[in-house]
Curated annotation (Swiss-Prot):
Additional facts recorded: Present with 4630 molecules/cell in log phase SD medium.
Sequence ranges of Low complexity compositional bias: 8-23, 189-212, 420-449, 479-508, 552-567
Name of the protein described by the UniProt record: RNA-binding protein PIN4
Organism: Saccharomyces cerevisiae (strain ATCC 204508 / S288c) (Baker's yeast)
Gene name of the record: PIN4
Cross-referenced SUPFAM superfamilies: RNA-binding domain, RBD
Modified residues (Phosphoserine): S56, S189, S191, S194, S197, S393, S466, S541, S636, S638, S640, S653, S655
Cellular component GO terms held in the UniProt record: cytoplasm; nucleus
Length: 668
């Protein structure tokens, strides 16, 4: 029954049945054992292979059975345990290769087998081979001609291949089917994701309406007239078609990113994509051990979930197409949840805009990031505070001294240049010492210096005798408008120069607030900032050799006796006297340009001032010009109406000080 079924079966079925039993038959083991026992009796001395003992008798019986089998008619009934299209070739010399044996069969004009294999036992050839033919007639012809043929002194033994018992065959077939099913299931599960993605990419061009239905009502509700022509609307409506048309994707879709608005860069991306579309991509095979688990809270059988997942997945992989993916803010809560979960799963970032949910990648190259920040106006937050910033002056007090010196040196250079270029005129320096008080006035073209009135020792009294000086200063400073206030006097003590200098520094602690404000902060009209008590410590000052005095408009009243001036004026001011030529050049021309050119000035010798060189004057505080000098000196901030203005101008750099409690003593 089995023989007739094999005869009528097609060659493919016969081949499958034969292959299933090639390596799993007891006949193979018996043949191997026989060939091993036969090789033990080979006479190696004469070089002739002879068979002795029981092996020769067994071989004789096999030859007889083979002869009887060959003499039987081909259409007769064969044994039930043989395969009519498969043969076993035994006793092959070890030195004969498979190709050589096939050449011998071809030289004998025998039909060649469609499958021919040597059998190896633990990697060692034992003289056994299997051959499969397409028809039983070819098999019978090969057995008749090849059986008993001597090759290299050994006679070949060719016979039909025996089949295993029925129970054993069923067991082997069942194991093979189970193993084949497991392999197919594993291959199918691993390739489903990639196949679905490819099919969705190919069919997304025809399914554009499903994508438009998802967002049509939402997009129509958000200012349809203005949104119809916007790049983001075109991007959302054409998202599915863009996934399929890889060559024309950027031609039909404007870029969402702010970096790629230039037409030249836009065209470059189109050309690059056209070139890359023809290249081959070697896709990596997915592995169950490396694939991340999809989120369990989402149903990927839902069409909306699959559509959003496809869009986000393509956006994540196609970095050169666009840098942002936008969804309208009016989508449903379920869609927002799907987008949020999928962004977390794919490693994307959500940015909420007033009208859109913008999806971005976490990885962005540095050049595009800097360009994006510049266009968004966010570059200032990416850089640390510079030394000239008042916000960082609290912890950058070391560099502020060097800034003061540099700015004072620049101001001194500009003074010297103006003195050389201007014409020469004389300016008299008068001395008003009726009460024995030295008078020093120091006014800048940009802003006035604080008035120093140290309990009667130093007071500021302008004495202008030159006609030109009166013309230039009549609108800014007029001594006639300032009533003379009685100044308290102190007795003169005979001290050394060093002691007088130290006493001058100590007097600043008891001065009115006029000596505690940087000169560059106020305007040129009156000494508005002279009542500021916010300087940290007036007793600490840099060395006098490093403090260039603010002497752009200096009018110094000299007493009749020079020795008396040297006793009452600090050493730092003794070497700073200017000639009348320089005084006029500094006063006259610079006063007219006081509003157009503002020069930075030092802060009255205080190391701990928190003002930067950019803090000039505040226009909102000029309303206090009606106050006279006495009010400016003796009135506090709250009484003079300057409290709010000074607090607004200085709170950014003097945040560590108490602006309310002005009677509080300094602790440093």
């Amino acid at each position: 029954m089995e023989t007739s079924s094999f005869e009528n079966a097609p060659p493919a079925a016969i081949n499958d049945a034969q292959d299933n039993n090639i390596n799993t038959e007891t006949n193979d083991q018996e043949t191997n054992q026989q060939s091993i026992e036969t090789r033990d009796a080979i006479d190696k001395e004469n070089g002739v292979q002879t068979e002795t003992g029981e092996n020769s008798a067994k071989n004789a019986e096999q030859n007889v059975s083979s002869t009887n089998l060959n003499n039987a008619p081909t259409n007769g009934a064969l044994d039930d345990d043989v395969i009519p299209n498969a043969i076993v070739i035994k006793n092959i010399p070890f030195a004969i290769k498979k190709e050589q044996l096939l050449d011998i069969i071809e030289e004998m004009d025998l039909p060649l087998p469609y499958a021919f294999n040597y059998h190896f036992d633990n990697g060692i050839f034992r003289g056994l081979a299997f051959a499969n033919f397409t028809t039983p007639e070819e098999t019978t012809q090969v057995i008749t001609s090849l059986n008993g043929k001597e090759i290299s002194g050994r006679k070949l033994k060719v016979e039909y291949k025996k089949m295993l018992p029925q129970a054993e065959r069923e067991r082997i077939e069942r194991e093979k089917r189970e193993k084949r099913g497991q392999l197919e299931e594993q291959h199918r599960s691993s390739s489903n994701l990639s196949l679905d993605s490819l099919s969705k990419m190919s069919g997304s061009g025809n399914n554009n309406t499903s994508n438009n239905q998802l967002f049509s009502t939402l997009m129509n509700g958000i200012n349809a007239n203005s949104m119809m022509n916007s790049p983001m609307n075109n991007t959302i409506n054409n998202n599915s078609s863009n996934n399929n048309n890889s060559g024309n994707i950027i031609l039909n879709q404007p870029s969402l990113s702010a970096q790629h608005t230039s037409s030249s860069l836009y065209q470059t991306n189109v050309n690059n994509q056209a070139q890359m579309s023809t290249e081959r991509f070697y896709a990596p095979l997915p592995s169950t051990s490396t694939l991340p688990l999809p989120p369990q809270q989402l149903d990927f059988n839902d069409p909306d979930t699959l559509e959003i997942y496809s869009q986000l997945l393509l956006f994540k992989d196609r970095e050169k197409y666009y840098y942002e993916l936008a969804y309208p803010m009016g989508i449903s809560a379920s869609h927002k949840r799907i987008i949020n979960v999928l962004c977390s799963y794919l490693g994307l970032v959500e940015v909420y805009d007033p009208r859109f949910i913008i999806i971005r990648r976490k990885i962005l190259d540095h050049a595009n990031l800097q360009s994006h920040l510049q266009q968004q106006g966010q570059m200032t937050s990416a850089h640390p505070l510079q030394p000239n910033s008042t916000g960082g002056s609290m912890n950058r007090s070391q560099s502020y001294t060097s800034l003061l010196q540099a700015h004072a040196a620049a101001a001194a250079n500009s003074i010297s240049n103006q003195a050389v270029n201007n014409s020469s005129n004389s300016n008299t320096i008068n001395s008003n010492n009726g009460n024995g008080n030295n008078v020093i006035i120091n006014n800048n073209s940009a802003s006035s210096t604080p008035k120093i009135s140290s309990q009667g020792q130093f007071s500021m009294q302008p004495t202008l005798t030159s006609p030109k000086m009166n013309i230039h200063h009549s609108s800014q400073y007029n001594s006639a408008d300032q009533p003379q206030q009685p100044q308290p006097q102190t007795q003169q003590n005979v001290q050394s120069a060093a002691q007088q200098q130290q006493s001058f520094l100590r007097q600043q602690a008891t001065l009115t607030p006029s000596s505690r404000i940087p000169s560059g902060y106020s305007a040129n009209h009156y000494q508005i900032n002279s009542v500021n008590p916010l300087l940290r410590n007036s007793q600490i000052s840099p060395p006098n050799s490093q403090i260039p005095i603010n002497s752009q408009t200096l009018s110094q009243a000299q007493p009749p006796a020079q020795s008396q001036t040297q006793q009452r004026v600090p050493v730092a001011y003794q070497n700073a006297s200017l000639s009348s030529q320089q005084l006029y050049n500094l006063n006259g021309p610079s006063s007219a340009n006081s509003q157009s050119q503002l020069l930075p000035q030092h802060t009255n010798g205080s190391v701990h001032s928190n003002f930067s060189y950019q803090s000039y004057h505040d226009e909102s505080m000029l309303s206090a010009h009606n106050l006279n000098s006495a009010d400016l000196i003796y009135k506090s901030l709250s009484h003079s109406g300057l409290d709010d203005g000074l607090e607004q101008g200085l709170n950014r750099s003097l945040s560590g000080l108490d602006l309310q409690n002005q009677n509080k003593k300094n602790l440093w």
